[in-house]
């Protein structure tokens, strides 16, 4: 769509709140945003200068749509729904992989107390989140001792051990009044909402009464329950003087990135935090609002009783997203300090991110650039490294790994079974692999490397260059990596005639070469072992009556390795889908093979 068309549409934008949807050449919605004034916000994308990430977004925009709303609040709610519907790739994508555990009282005739990571609208009562399963289990263990709700998912025909331990009322055998369950549930709710001190005081009274009545065993049980409450519920430092559940938000921005920190305060304690980092393309406060809206759309994030927000945030818009929660923008005191702490943590997290990025840049892109300078060639952004692997010439293989801008590109790794070389001949092997690889590159018009690295010396390098130049007509720099007597990367050989490229052994470019050599060696060795394992497996099975290619394949698939087959009984071999008589023959053959190998080792 022409630039003139976009300019015409920009001129028609209204001076009202709403949402806008950016589209690419295929008509796919790639970004959804909201604005208090559509005209100003949308026009800003097509005027002035932008940072690199916003520029990438703008370069892909060929059309846009907009939807006018009656208020900024309505725009936020609409934006959340549009993002959920279209999943635009430039929008914030909150990860769903981190889910926190909750304690749940199930909504059943005979309720249970369970730990779950899924919060559903099923009339159950949920408490949490807890920082981890261990913490949730500790609390549940106390509740199980105090309140004997059923433990079985389905009712058995007779009482279980929990009944004898006093931790179940055995509804499988006895009638339990609904009022009894309600009484226990109310006490559990009180306990989990911060009232555990009341429960603890009641237990202390019961312990004293039992001791006075000479019921020392019962008094000891009450004492253990009190200790469990103290160690589990009171071991965390209090952050607030009450027991209200709160989420505290703080965010920081830098270099086009936003970091949001959320502190989960439950029962007056800071139990966990959630950290999200992402690029933003809108105004920071607008994207922060969008984040909050999406945050509470996730099933495992139940809005608490209160949410604390930093200054300059549209609390009315947030209130529309979580209507049953009290929205607070603290101005002073402990509450303000918590918001500041969330901001401080967000700022630190962003600083760490950029420091790590700089460090990563230094060891990858920077190292590649300096490697090119040291070798006197253009920056080798794409490097393909080769290594051969064989044992006394058996099952010879070769492997190639690819590094793009100093990082492994595993989709571009390749494995080769050597077809034309008999016996251990590294030079001939290198010729075959280079020929096969770059003949295919030419045929399929694949990306050419800027540098080829050979794990070897002059002979391997000359073999590779001969095939490239004289057979394929290619002019690609080829270098060799030599190793010392401890099999560690020692020297980089390059040029005509070959010379040692002077590299500091503690430089990032030298470390990069080490990583390349180690990676291609690992890849080749792994492939060679897989091949040997498969052929070794099949050769041991050769000559066994009733075991042809099909059954060999079946046994290999079932056991996965020779080691497991050697340890298998006749019955276990039969489970692989072979007849009993064949399983007996296989077992007999392998037992004889093992004995022979054992005797050979002893000699």
Curated annotation (Swiss-Prot):
Domain UVR: 197-232
Gene Ontology biological process: nucleotide-excision repair; SOS response
Every GIY-YIG domain range: 15-92
Keywords, sorted A to Z: Cytoplasm, DNA damage, DNA excision, DNA repair, Excision nuclease, SOS response
Domain of life: Bacteria
Localization, UniProt: Cytoplasm
Coarse class of the protein's main subcellular location: cytoplasm
Cellular-component GO terms for this entry: cytoplasm; excinuclease repair complex
Any GO MF annotation of the entry: excinuclease ABC activity
Pfam families on file: GIY-YIG, HHH_2, UVR, UvrC_RNaseH, UvrC_RNaseH_dom
Similarity comment text for this entry: Belongs to the UvrC family.
Function summary: The UvrABC repair system catalyzes the recognition and processing of DNA lesions. UvrC both incises the 5' and 3' sides of the lesion. The N-terminal half is responsible for the 3' incision and the C-terminal half is responsible for the 5' incision.
PANTHER family with a match to the protein in the record: UVRABC SYSTEM PROTEIN C, UVRC/OXIDOREDUCTASE
Subunit structure: Interacts with UvrB in an incision complex.
HAMAP family xref list: UvrC
Name by which UniProt lists this protein: UvrABC system protein C
Provenance organism: Listeria monocytogenes serotype 4b (strain F2365)
């Amino acid at each position: 769509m022409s630039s003139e068309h976009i300019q015409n549409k920009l001129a028609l934008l209204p001076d009202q709140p709403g949402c806008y949807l950016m589209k690419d050449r295929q008509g796919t919605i790639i970004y959804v945003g909201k604005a208090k004034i559509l005209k100003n916000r949308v026009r800003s994308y097509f005027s002035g200068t932008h940072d690199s990430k916003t520029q990438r977004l703008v370069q892909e925009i060929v059309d846009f749509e907009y939807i006018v709303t009656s208020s900024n609040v309505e725009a936020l709610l609409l934006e959340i729904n549009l993002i959920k519907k279209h999943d635009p790739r430039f929008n914030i994508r909150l990860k769903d992989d981190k889910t926190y555990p909750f304690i749940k009282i199930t909504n059943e005739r005979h309720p249970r107390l369970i730990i779950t990571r899924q919060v559903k609208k099923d009339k159950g009562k949920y408490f949490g989140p807890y920082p981890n399963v261990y913490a949730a289990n500790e609390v549940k263990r106390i509740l199980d001792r105090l309140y004997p709700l059923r433990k079985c998912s389905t009712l058995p025909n007779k009482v279980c051990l929990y009944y004898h331990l006093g931790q179940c009322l055995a509804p499988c055998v006895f009638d339990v009044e609904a009022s009894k369950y309600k009484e226990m549930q109310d006490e559990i709710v009180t306990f989990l909402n911060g009232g555990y001190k009341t429960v603890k005081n009641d237990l202390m009274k019961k312990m004293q009464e039992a001791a006075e009545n000479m019921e020392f065993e019962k008094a000891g049980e009450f004492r253990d329950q009190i200790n469990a409450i103290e160690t589990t519920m009171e071991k965390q430092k209090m952050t607030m003087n009450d027991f209200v559940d709160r989420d505290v938000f703080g965010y920081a921005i830098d270099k086009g990135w936003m970091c949001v920190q959320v502190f989960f305060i439950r029962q007056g304690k800071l139990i966990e935090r959630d950290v999200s980092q992402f690029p933003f393309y809108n105004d920071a406060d607008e994207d922060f609002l969008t984040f909050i809206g999406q945050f509470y759309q996730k099933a495992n994030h139940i809005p608490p009783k209160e949410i604390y927000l930093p200054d300059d945030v549209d609390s009315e818009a947030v209130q529309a997203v979580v209507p049953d929660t009290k929205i607070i923008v603290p101005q002073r005191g402990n509450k303000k300090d918590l918001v500041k702490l969330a901001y401080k943590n967000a700022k630190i997290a962003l600083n760490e991110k950029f420091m790590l990025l700089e460090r990563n840049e230094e060891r990858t892109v920077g190292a590649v650039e300096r490697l090119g300078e040291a070798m006197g060639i253009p920056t080798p952004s794409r490097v393909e490294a080769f290594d051969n692997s064989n044992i006394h010439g058996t099952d010879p293989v070769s492997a190639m790994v690819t590094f793009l801008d100093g990082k492994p590109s595993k989709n571009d790794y390749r494995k080769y079974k050597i077809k034309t070389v008999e016996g251990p001949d590294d030079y001939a092997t290198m010729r075959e692999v280079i020929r096969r690889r770059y003949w295919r590159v030419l045929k399929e018009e694949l990306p050419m490397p800027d540098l080829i690295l050979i794990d070897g010396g002059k002979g391997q390098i000359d073999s590779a260059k001969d095939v490239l130049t004289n057979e394929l007509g290619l002019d690609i720099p080829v270098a060799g990596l030599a190793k010392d007597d401890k099999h560690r990367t020692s020297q980089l050989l390059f040029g005509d005639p070959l010379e040692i490229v002077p590299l500091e052994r503690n430089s990032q470019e030298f470390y990069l070469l080490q990583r390349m050599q180690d990676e291609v060696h690992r890849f080749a060795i792994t492939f060679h072992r897989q091949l040997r394992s498969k052929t070794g497996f099949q050769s041991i099975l050769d000559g066994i009556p009733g075991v042809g290619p099909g059954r060999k394949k079946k046994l290999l698939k079932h056991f996965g390795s020779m080691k497991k087959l050697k340890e298998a009984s006749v019955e276990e071999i039969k489970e692989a889908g072979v007849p009993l008589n064949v399983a007996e023959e296989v077992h007999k053959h392998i037992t004889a093979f093992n004995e022979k190998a054992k005797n050979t080792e002893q000699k």
